């Protein structure tokens, strides 16, 4: 029943009837062992509905970024529906934390977040300099913490991970700025926990490809790493 409301009113109401909406949807999303009916908010369906900046689709990975997303939603001088993927496991994840200063007015919502290891205070391994990085992994959502844990366990200092916190409107220029230092030597990979026909892959692929072309990356084809196509 909700799909009809989302398709006919939330996604297209402003275009059809000039009716702006600031509705916020918090949708549980993530592979957490609860079965298919509890694992997917159908992120791919929301991204298919996106066009002409009609929606905002987020997948936040820090408390501060979630706070600033809601704060921004209230203080903007226009209204757009806000769709947020909200994995339950991040409520208790030891690395999903923010400093009190991160919630202040000095900070704001970040559409892209960098690797924890780039901040030496976090206690993670020290990464090689940008020219020696071999793989740049781009992801969104809670899989970031799985990738972070796996890299720490392997002690691989030649992999860096970036998180896309705002999937639409896609922050292509911000991503280009973040990836440019790695353009010469690194391979670029999109990683997701959803099956290939779900999640954000088919939506972000062209944006990331534009980004790699824009920064003139030596390895300018983005690779996919994740589950194969699945029916559920």
Task: Name each model feature, range by range.
Residues 1, 56-61:
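Extended catalytic/binding region for NAD+/ADP-ribose chemistry, centered on the ART fold
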Residues 1-22, 28-48, 68, 76-79, 92-232:
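Thiamine diphosphate
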Residues 10, 14, 71, 176-180:
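Generic structural signal for well-ordered alpha-helical scaffold segments
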Residues 51-52:
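Short glycine-enriched loop/turn motifs at secondary-structure junctions
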Residues 59, 64-96:
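Structural signature of the thiamine diphosphate
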């Amino acid at each position: 029943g909700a799909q009809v409301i989302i398709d006919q009113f939330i996604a297209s109401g402003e275009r059809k009837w000039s009716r702006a909406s600031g509705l916020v949807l918090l949708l549980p999303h993530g592979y957490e062992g609860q079965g298919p009916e509890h694992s997917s908010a159908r992120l791919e369906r929301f991204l298919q509905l996106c066009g002409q900046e009609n929606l905002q689709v987020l997948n936040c990975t820090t408390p501060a970024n979630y706070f600033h997303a809601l704060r921004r939603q209230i203080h903007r001088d226009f209204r757009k529906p806000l769709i947020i993927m909200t994995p339950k496991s991040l409520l208790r994840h030891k690395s999903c934390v923010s400093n009190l200063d991160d919630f202040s007015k000095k900070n704001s919502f970040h559409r892209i977040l960098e690797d924890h290891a780039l901040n030496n205070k976090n206690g993670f391994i020290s990464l090689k300099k940008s020219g020696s990085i071999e793989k740049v992994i781009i992801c969104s959502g809670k899989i970031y913490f799985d990738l972070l844990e796996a890299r720490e366990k392997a002690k691989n200092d030649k992999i860096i991970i970036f998180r896309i916190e705002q999937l639409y409107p896609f922050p292509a220029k911000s991503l280009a700025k973040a990836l440019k230092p790695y353009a010469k030597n690194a391979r670029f990979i999109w990683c997701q926990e959803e099956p290939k026909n779900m999640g954000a892959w088919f939506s972000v692929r062209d944006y990331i490809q534009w980004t790699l072309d824009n920064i003139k990356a030596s390895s300018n084809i983005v690779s996919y790493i994740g589950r194969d196509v699945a029916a559920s």
